[in-house]
């Protein structure tokens, strides 16, 4: 890359990195009244608008033409309105941050840990260790970078009432953190329905803007959707709603440089006679929505097996780890 092109790329990237907190009213064509309407619906910053869909904004500002102009202005301000070279994408990916799982073998399987700007799905049966991993990640993100963390806070959305602060304290103590402070660094909310779950994700944006948050956990992403939309007759409506939820999570991860971890339940395939009859719930929506997909399963005693079964660049592979009083360990 020539020095001029490299400088242009650096300027564009710098613009992306320094603009996220610009108030939405800084945008051309957005005055106080429109700004108030956008903020009421969760669009506080230029970056919020840049990652929104035109249809989404049209419902707020009144028509698609004006919404298109506002979205384009936001993307232009962030340098997101044009193509870039693959080399520039590669340079940006070098700046991706990772959170250690606390299990060396699992980190190696994931290429260094859980990535920011991505959605990582963790699927498995009841008792396979999904929630245990979520608890551990909520602690690990708080560690300094030299110890595998990001020196940051976490947001934990609990849909099945499985979050246990006592477990956080155990893991924190084992990792040399003050247990009370570790709990104080986790923003927790219980989601009571799929609508509430989606509202909480919108509210999470405000917390991320105001605090040093680098991890958002949704445990589990599918539970309310399955219980509220039973039967084939409701499947299309469920998947449409789930699709919006997953898209919101992907946008949030990319817009705010946070790691999003979602857990997923499993379902049986009655027509499978050989191999594993179980598959992750959520169908193609979750299959295409998650950036990385992990499958956890039980082995003997307290041993669990983690397999990466879908990734843009990781090869398939599996590793084992143990669940102990101190957390997940090799």
Swiss-Prot record:
Domain of life per record: Archaea
Protein name: DNA repair and recombination protein RadA
Entries under PROSITE patterns matching the protein: RECA_2 (PS50162), RECA_3 (PS50163)
UniProt keyword terms in alphabetical order: ATP-binding, DNA damage, DNA recombination, DNA-binding, Nucleotide-binding
Example GO BP: DNA repair
Protein source organism: Pyrobaculum islandicum (strain DSM 4184 / JCM 9189 / GEO3)
GO molecular function, one term: ATP-dependent DNA damage sensor activity
Functional summary from the UniProt entry: Involved in DNA repair and in homologous recombination. Binds and assemble on single-stranded DNA to form a nucleoprotein filament. Hydrolyzes ATP in a ssDNA-dependent manner and promotes DNA strand exchange between homologous DNA molecules.
Pfam families xref list: HHH_5, Rad51
The keyword rRNA processing is annotated on this UniProt entry: no
Family the entry assigns: Belongs to the eukaryotic RecA-like protein family.
SUPFAM superfamilies membership: P-loop containing nucleoside triphosphate hydrolases, Rad51 N-terminal domain-like
PANTHER family tied to this protein: MEIOTIC RECOMBINATION PROTEIN DMC1_LIM15 HOMOLOG, RECA/RAD51/RADA DNA STRAND-PAIRING FAMILY MEMBER
Binding site for ATP: 124-131
